[in-house]
Every structure is written in C-alpha cells, then in structure tokens.
Amino acid sequence: MIIKNEWLIVGFITSCHGINGQLKVKSLSDFEERFLKPGMRWLQKESEHPSKIELISGFKQPGKEIFIVKFKGINTRNHAEQLKKCKLLVKSDKLPKLKKEEFHLLELIDLEVKTLENDELKIIGKVINLENEKNNLLIIELFKNQKKVLIPFVKEIVPLVDIKNNFLIINPPNGLLEL
C-alpha cells in the first residue's frame, strides 16, 4: 500500500540473506538506483517513525523484483532479523522529475473515478489507495455502496488519467465492479 503524505514506500524488507547482515528487499519502485546506489535511506518499523540508515551496497536478483542490500552497522544475521518487515521509504518531495504527461502513482490517490455511460461521464467513486505487488492495482471506493474494488492500472481499463483536473476514467470489463 502507498500512503499519500510526506513518505512514499519504495520497498519492504522480506528476509535475511546469508550470515553477514544482508537483507532481501521487495521493490515497489521503478527506480532501481534506490536499492543499488550507496547513500542515506529511510527505514520504518511498524508503528514507529522513519529513521535514517546508510545503504552501503545492493544488487538485483536476476529475474525478480528482489534486491539484496547491505546497510551500515548491520553486520550479523541477528541484526538483520530485527529489520525484517521494515518499510524502505523516500520523502515524497524527493521524487524524480518526470516528463510532461507522466505522473507518480502516488498522485492517483484521491482522484475521482469516472466511467463513460451513454456518452456521458459519470462519477462512480474515488481512488483511496494503491496496491503494488507484481502489478499496480487501484483501490477504488464506490460511492453507491462504499464497497472497495481493485482495478488493474492498465491502459485498456484506465484509458485516461487527468491529474490537473483530478479525475481518471475507467473502462472496466463487465462484472469487474460487482466482484
């Protein structure tokens, strides 16, 4: 899940790797350098404030969205075990600049969701969050019944995103909103 505030979750520590304090991180980011390039990062344990930690090195496991990382001061498996399930964060004001017509997934939260019915746009709900495991999914709350539905964020289903005017249009396959 991505939370719209000053932090953006870019990965989760899933497990330890080896005995020298290395960790496996599941990436939620399109920017691999967040896990490869040494420098300061932010970690957050459950129900705690984020804290700084220095990334020393990292590499990507072939064919996976998993990175093996090494943080300064984490030198044993026991130290690494304490960081399992931590979130790897970046400050939302440090997001990379994008080209025109591009946007960060974080910007989709709170957009109105519209469908085209009989040549008319109808507001049916709003994006309340995102889920990003293997594919990006929009979590949409429908206004008619406050039901939450997951919508795949693909061009065929979400043909238009208008950040400037605060809405997106979905073209869901029959039955998707009734699930």
UniProtKB/Swiss-Prot annotation:
Keyword Nucleotide-binding in annotation: no
Keyword Nucleotide-binding (UniProt): no
InterPro entries attached to this UniProt entry: PRC_barrel-like_sf, PRC_RimM, RimM, RimM_N, RimM_N_sf, Transl_B-barrel_sf
Molecular function per GO: ribosome binding
Subunit and interaction comment: Binds ribosomal protein uS19.
Homology family: Belongs to the RimM family.
Descriptive protein name: Ribosome maturation factor RimM
Organism field: Prochlorococcus marinus (strain AS9601)
